[in-house]
């Protein structure tokens, strides 16, 4: 089975990995997704579009869900892409590909017309980075 986009892989993996079935197919899907990582270390949703934080974050989450270690070179390249494309305000800019279907209003999230997809892209990027963060055990404020 060949799955062309990170979006399709993640949708497929959500059910299949958690079911514990089809391990060979999961490995094949992982390899297919890894093969679509670009020279800039990111992923794109559609082959002809630029890499984005949205697609890269989603691809990394899919790969980690499928069993790729966050220490793997592929994952770390994706992390570097995300860190290199993060905006000064902490968000990631993702250009919308959709037609305008509702009146524009400013939510307060940066990037104007592209704020909604950028908010989702920022969420995926943040999730992917959090998976790669070192484990941290919180301590009580009083030190106990």
Over which residues does each language-model region extend?
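An alpha-helical repeat/solenoid feature that recognizes helix-turn-helix modules
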Residues: 1-31, 35-138
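Eukaryotic intrinsically disordered, low-complexity regulatory tails and linkers enriched
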Residues: 140-144
């Amino acid at each position: 089975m060949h799955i062309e986009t990170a979006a399709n892989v993640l949708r497929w993996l959500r059910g299949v990995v958690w079911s514990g079935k089809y391990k060979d197919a999961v490995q094949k899907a992982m390899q297919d997704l890894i093969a679509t990582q670009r020279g800039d270390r990111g992923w794109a949703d559609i082959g002809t579009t630029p890499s984005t934080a949205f697609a890269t974050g989603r691809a990394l989450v899919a790969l980690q869900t499928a069993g790729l270690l966050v220490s793997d070179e592929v994952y770390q390249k994706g992390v570097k892409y995300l860190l290199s494309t993060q905006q000064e305000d902490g968000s990631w800019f993702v250009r919308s590909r959709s037609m305008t279907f509702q009146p524009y209003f400013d939510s307060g999230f940066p990037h104007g017309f592209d704020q909604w997809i950028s908010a989702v892209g920022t969420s995926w990027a943040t999730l992917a980075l959090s998976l790669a963060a070192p484990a941290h055990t919180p301590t009580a404020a009083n030190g106990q």
